[in-house]
Structures are given as C-alpha cells and as structure tokens.
Amino acid sequence: MRRRAGGGTPPSGIPLPSALPRPAGSTPPPSGDPSGAVPARLGLLPPPEEPDALEAWYLNRTPFDRGPLAGATWQGEIDRAVLWLDALPYSGRAVELGAGIGFWTVLLASRGDVSAYDAREDRLTRARQRLLAHGLKAHLHPRKLLEGPEGEPAGLVLLPFLLSQLAAEPRAQQVEVAHSWLAKGGRLALIDLAPPNLDPSTLEQATSEMLGGRFTEIVSEPLGRHLILISALAK
C-alpha cells in the first residue's frame, strides 16, 4: 500500500461494517484512533489539498495508483459517477459540501441553483474558473464544512470524497450537518472511495451504520475497484 511522501497515513475508504473483521493485510488505524476506515483500493491516495494536485488526481495524470489498468478503471468509474449524479432526481437547490476545484459543481450548476462550500479559497478560485469556462454560475462560499446550514433547505446535498477521509466522530458530525441542510425528503448523495475487498453484500450494512438513523431509502453501489455511490433521503 502506497503512502504519502514523508510517512503520512494511508488513504481511507468508506468504513466497513463494525461487525466484520478487517481484510487480511489491511492497515489498522493507529492505537486510539477510532476512524473505522480502511485503506482505499490499489494504493489510491486521498484527494490532495492543492488545486493543481487535485486536478491531476481527478484526471489521473500522475501516478496516484498502480499502473495503467488502475488508471483506466479509475477514469471509467469517474465517468460512471458523473452519469449517476446527473440522473439523480431532486427538486429545489443543490448544496455541495467539499466542492474543491468544482469538478462536480459544474454538473450541478448545469441542472439548476447550487451553493458550493469549501474550506479553501484557492480551490474555490479554481471552481470559479471552471464555471466561467462552461458559461455557468454557482454560489461559492469559503466556509468550514461543519458549520450549520444557511438559506432555504436543499433538495440535494452532495459530499464528494469527504466522509472516507474523516475519523469516526467528525464523520458522524458531518453526516448530521449534511442532514440539517436538507429539506424533509431531500436527497443525500455521496461519491467516495471504496475500502479494499469490500463484499457488496455488506455495503448496505456499512452505509446504514455510517448514516445513522437520519435517512431512508438508502441505496449504495460499488462501481468496481475505486468508488462507491450512495444515495439516501432525509427523514
């Protein structure tokens, strides 16, 4: 499993169900770390912080994974995630928490009103440039993602590559915050990294544990080697 330069921690995927053992050979969290996450597949590093590196991560232009096959499957799964998000039904405005460089913001803006939030202004600057290049508009806000909602309740809240990078406590807080943004019956959409060797039959249990009791009609789908798509409606 590849690690960040300088001895950083390995990437994390969506947590496995609490009742299941970790896959053989996976890296356990450090002592006292309640993250409940496991390393992501094929050595994919988590989303980088810097805008240029994040662009490369999405486009797979640098060796974030092991070899050309992994790169090809990554891009194919990203393309499928785009089609999935574009087809998700919702009404009202969309909110994106962790918008980054605006990769998904452009798609949401093409469908209607969207407010996109990220903790870093430099990433939102890149998102603004991407929107302008497509002739689209969105409300971009530099803001901590755990802050409470503003404006009218949303019909869709998107969390792209966010929950898998959080330890258990902030992950639960982020799910609670995402729920607070939504109107009753509003849709939560997650696009995130998969853990290695995840049995699809356990994915529903893992997702239900992660989302708690705030959502219904939970649908989760592993795309293959890298990604998981999750949709749920707010109670």
PLM regions with names:
Residues 172-184:
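A short glycine-rich, Lys/Arg-flanked "PGG" loop and its adjoining helix->strand segment in the class I
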Residues 2-92, 100-134, 142-149, 168-169, ...:
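Class I (Rossmann-like) S-adenosyl-L-methionine-dependent methyltransferase catalytic domain
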Residues 158:
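A conserved beta-strand element that flanks and buttresses the S-adenosyl-L-methionine
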Residues 137:
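Conserved H-loop
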Residues 161-162:
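Short catalytic micro-motifs in class I SAM-dependent methyltransferases
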Residues 96:
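Class I SAM-dependent methyltransferase core
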